[in-house]
């Protein structure tokens, strides 16, 4: 921001997937370090961000643990441990260094993250997606319930993308009008579908 050719009055961050976790981490660390830019941050948009993790990483970690218990399958467990720190952060949605410090990131462990709310004084928006279309019929409500809990956008469940958690302390306080669910859309399609762009424009224009 200091190198920008003119003075920056306000900053908006548009993030996708793990980029949202990085943005939350950066906001917290910058505030603790006394940096100036968090005061310029006015809007923060999350698209498909796994605020509370992604089941696929947890399943992968469980499989890796099973493989490591048997001598004959242990070499395959070593392959599973090639996963990057960023990928293992997806297990629960780690944001702060303290969330993984002094822990073996490949070991199965309960969610021990520090509670971190959304940055204060910033308008935050959450876009979540589900691969299930609106649909009709007697099983429509069942399909939607399963999608909310399990499928989501194919990587991130709806509840995780919306910051919802069974522990109220961990639920992120997105205003209802700042949440939007895209139907019939997967994780990567959030980056290119016109419906998403229209919603972002509506939010950001309304916030100016």
Regions found by a protein language model. Give the residues of each.
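Helical cap/lid subdomain of alpha/beta-hydrolase-fold lipid enzymes
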Residues: 28-208
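Short, well-ordered amphipathic alpha-helices
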Residues: 1, 23-32
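Conserved acidic catalytic loop of the alpha/beta-hydrolase fold
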Residues: 1-11
